[in-house]
């Protein structure tokens, strides 16, 4: 038995300089596991609650001392003596202790910190790398990275409404080569921007945040960068979009909700018109994935988008599903989207995270493991991606050490797996077969 003998929670800073929760879990054997939780900028309304202090005189109200106090008192009392290898029981203990549907009392940032730290300690105790602890002998598939090279929306201060424009190296023979292709394209794009006199400052997730004429201008610059890096758009490197459409779904002039695209000259579009615009881009450019193409509350819009594009491109629900099996099941039943974004802090425990991944796979939906815009050096999501054979990961651009921590961990895992490592490439998009 790997009994938990001590838990220490603390407040640290994330990649945006905002407080977040870190947790150390000590086992009877002397083994320790440490984990830190991420935080999002654009968040779904039904995400598990991230507990913040609200004291405007300290970290602008974003302190997490309350969550840390919960960790060091009642959470510690509840889990001391439990077997760290019994992850599901431990996570149920945390859920029951909180007693709310959305972890509003203790905070998902507190429960997740413990959940991840316990898993790390148990893996260390068992002598297994974390990805192997999660996936057993079956975890050998590296994820295809969706690399956010242009930031907009809530992740940048520019003219773009869409939050992320991504490159996806579907034609690479290995994860190592996929990272190289992405890095070379990133640097080619940087030179293109520099030569045009456009800022090469980066956003929260390491992508560039240029002010350009419109979204197509940004897409065309990315395609130019792919070409200048020596790769073929579509065949070797495809494109993905994260619209984060909830962020620009607003009341129009007559009071009805519309998609307000300031980056397209102030267009106000219905769900049908916005779908038509997306469909036009899909026909024109090698786009194979669209995340949050409609607002989280616009289920009718989602149904129309899925009907029009669901067989052509991956339609990922992030704010739509918030890593929640109840909401995902509703989407599956209604034929909404064909993929789910997996963000561990949207739900607050590893057990619930794995349940969402498994439900998606059973329904033929893909599961894309994802970072948040506020990250730390914690690389747990890299191990989750391989351990669950998810096949896809979103962990930012090719800059900022908080993003590189995940890519570098995946490079180590691929090296550790050796000849049995699998890089699925386009086959990771099995929802489009």
UniProtKB/Swiss-Prot annotation:
Q: How is the cofactor bound?
A: Binds a second Mg(2+) ion via substrate during catalysis.
Q: GO annotations under biological process?
A: glycolytic process
Cofactor(s) annotated in UniProt: Mg(2+)
Which keywords label this protein?
A: Cytoplasm, Glycolysis, Lyase, Magnesium, Metal-binding, Secreted
Residues bound to (2R)-2-phosphoglycerate are: 163, 343, 372-373, 394
Q: What family does the Swiss-Prot or TrEMBL record give for this protein?
A: Belongs to the enolase family.
| Name of protein | Enolase
- Gene name of the record: eno
């Amino acid at each position: 038995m790997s009994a938990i003998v001590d838990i220490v929670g603390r407040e640290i800073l994330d990649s945006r300089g905002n407080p977040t929760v870190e947790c150390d879990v000590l086992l009877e054997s002397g083994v320790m596991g440490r984990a830190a939780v991420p935080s999002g900028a654009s968040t779904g309304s039904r995400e598990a609650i991230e507990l913040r202090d609200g004291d405007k005189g300290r970290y602008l109200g974003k302190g997490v001392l309350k969550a840390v106090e919960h960790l060091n008192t009642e959470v510690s009392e509840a889990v001391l003596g439990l077997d760290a290898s019994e992850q599901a029981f431990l996570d149920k203990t945390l859920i029951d202790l909180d007693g709310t549907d959305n972890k509003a009392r203790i905070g998902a940032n507190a429960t997740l910190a413990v959940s991840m730290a316990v898993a790390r300690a148990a893996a260390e105790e068992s002598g297994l790398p974390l990805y192997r602890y999660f996936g057993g002998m079956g975890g050998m598939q590296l994820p295809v990275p969706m690399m956010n090279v242009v930031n907009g929306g809530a992740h940048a201060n520019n003219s773009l409404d869409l939050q992320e424009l991504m490159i996806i190296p579907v034609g690479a023979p290995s994860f190592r080569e996929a990272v190289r292709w992405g890095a070379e394209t990133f640097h080619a794009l940087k030179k293109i921007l520099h030569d045009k006199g456009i800022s090469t400052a980066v956003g929260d997730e390491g992508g560039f945040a240029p002010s350009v004429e419109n979204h197509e201008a940004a897409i065309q610059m990315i395609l130019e960068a792919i070409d200048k890096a020596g790769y073929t758009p579509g065949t070797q490197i495809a494109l993905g979009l994260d619209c984060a459409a909830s962020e620009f779904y607003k009341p129009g002039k007559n009071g009805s909700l519309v998609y307000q695209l300031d980056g397209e000259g102030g267009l106000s579009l219905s769900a049908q018109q916005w779908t038509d615009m997306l469909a036009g881009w899909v026909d024109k450019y090698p786009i194979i994935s669209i995340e949050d193409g409609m607002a989280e509350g616009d289920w009718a819009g989602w149904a129309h988008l899925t009907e029009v594009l669901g067989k052509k491109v991956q339609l990922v629900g992030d704010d739509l599903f918030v890593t929640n099996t109840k909401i995902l099941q509703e989407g599956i039943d209604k034929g909404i989207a064909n993929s789910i974004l997996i963000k561990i802090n949207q739900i607050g425990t590893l057990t619930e995270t794995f349940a969402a991944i498994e439900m998606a796979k059973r329904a033929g939906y893909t599961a894309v493991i994802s970072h948040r815009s506020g990250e730390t050096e914690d690389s747990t999501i890299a191990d989750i991606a391989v351990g669950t054979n998810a096949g896809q990961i979103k962990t930012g651009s090719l800059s900022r050490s908080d993003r590189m921590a995940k890519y570098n961990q995946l490079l180590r895992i691929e090296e550790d797996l050796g000849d049995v490592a699998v890089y699925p490439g386009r086959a990771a998009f099995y929802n489009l077969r």
